[in-house]
Amino acid sequence: MKKIIMLMGCLLCLVACEKENLTYENIDEGEDVDVSKLPSKKFTFTVKGEFESATFMSNATTFRAPVYLSGDGNAMTDLWVFDYMNDRCVQSIHQVSTDESWGKPQMSLAYGTHHVYFVASRGDSPTLDDEGHMIVWGIPKDTFWKDYSVEVVSTSNGNRAVTLDRVATKLKISVNDEVPSNLGEIAVTPEKWYYGLDYKTGDAVSAQKKERTVTVPESYYGTTGRLVANFFGISGSDEWTTNIAVEARGTDASVLGKASITGAPFKRNRATEYSGNLFASGGGFDVSISDDWDNPVTGEC
């Protein structure tokens, strides 16, 4: 009887060990598996943002996670987390800034190798495309991203701090001459502007030619050198260029001034500023590459 009990004990041990070693990686291809039933470990990710760029940014700022995720002085509104194993999305989370656990998403990760992709943004009207693994915004604004790799075993530390990198770029239009009292808006039309992000690669997607406008408050009428309009986009790590038409329009929609910008360069975590006289004839714009991402502005779009 003792021998039988010992044998049964060994068999139970073998079964338990086999279950412990079962991971998503060794499931047969095409097999339909409920990943939530695999051995797993609970992870809590504390999300923050690192705004330092080795080339352009001199000072680092961080998200005040988990309560308040902020980029350029404004709160992020959306946080997405996508968990991939064997190049397949097995689970995802979408948080908004009003969620109780905002900035500290939790996931149970099955044992094995994971790529966990994070996206934090305050862009307007986001649309998620699961098949294309991308997010496209109606109006992109400050946005951060990270591809975070983790190997999950039974002894893994389940508390992880994840630092995201800025993938947004910015066009700044600075008007140096006096603002007329009937100015209604500043409009820009880039020939190419990226509105989306491939959350697996971090590449900019969804290039569009679309007009963007910023409404000018009456408090700027009669002022000189104060009018600054910001226009955000998504950018990859490589520099790219586009041509831009700029118009200043009156409150009656009349054109008060305009300019053409050729070959404007853009790159993630960088502001490209054009400054000059928009209302004076023959004024033109000067270009500068700026690390002053967070300066006060008249308006943004």
Annotate the PLM regions:
Residues 1-4, 18-19:
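Positively charged n-region of N-terminal signal peptides that target proteins for export
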Residues 6-9:
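Sec-dependent N-terminal signal peptides
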Residues 13-16:
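C-terminal motif of bacterial Sec signal peptides marking the signal peptidase cleavage site
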Residues 18-78, 126-190, 287:
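Primarily secretory-pathway and cell-envelope proteins
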Residues 43, 116, 160, 171, ...:
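Hydrophobic residues positioned within well-ordered beta-strands of beta-sheet architectures
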Residues 65-130, 182-270, 295-301:
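Tryptophan-paired
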Residues 142-145, 266-279:
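Low-complexity, Pro/Ser/Thr- and charge-rich linker/hinge segments at domain boundaries
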Residues 277-301:
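Acidic, serine/threonine- and proline-rich intrinsically disordered appendage/tail regions
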